[in-house]
Amino acid sequence: LAKSIMLVFGLIVLPNISDGHHSHVNYVVSEFTQLEGVVREVHLINPHSWIYLEVQDGQDEPVIWALESTTPDGLLRNGIQPDFVRIGDRVQVRCHRQRDNHNACLLGFLTPLHGDSERGHGIEKEWD
């Protein structure tokens, strides 16, 4: 009986505890920041995928933004294949900016502008 109780505890309670560090408190989730630029790096890794986007600032200087996303499995569940975005692709994003005003965002939505309809050109997909 004790083993059964521990098994139930492990299956029900522990997965909820392990998800606790996935908070979005460091982002301004009540508003979106819109960016357009060129993908410089793509890292589809656990526990968070990352895209590094080169964007032109107000003085026409290139600035790199770090865009945090969900896991590779989470992206697949959202219909995003690994080749949806590649290095060198032009994209538009809507993201939640980091509260400390660094060039970092929680990536909400991404629209590829690479011209390849096979890879979803012009189709906005959710990344979180």
Task: Outline where the language-model segments fall.
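Conserved hydrophobic positions within beta-strands
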Residues: 37-39
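Short, structured beta-strand/loop micro-motifs enriched in basic residues and often containing a Trp
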Residues: 68-77
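Short nucleic-acid-contacting surface segments enriched for D/E, G, S/T with interspersed K/R
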Residues: 77-92
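Short boundary/loop segments of OB/S1/cold-shock single-stranded nucleic-acid-binding domains
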Residues: 18-33
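OB-fold/S1-family single-stranded nucleic acid-binding modules
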Residues: 98-127
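Bacterial N-terminal signal peptides
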Residues: 3-16
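Short aromatic-glycine-enriched beta-strand elements
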Residues: 45-56
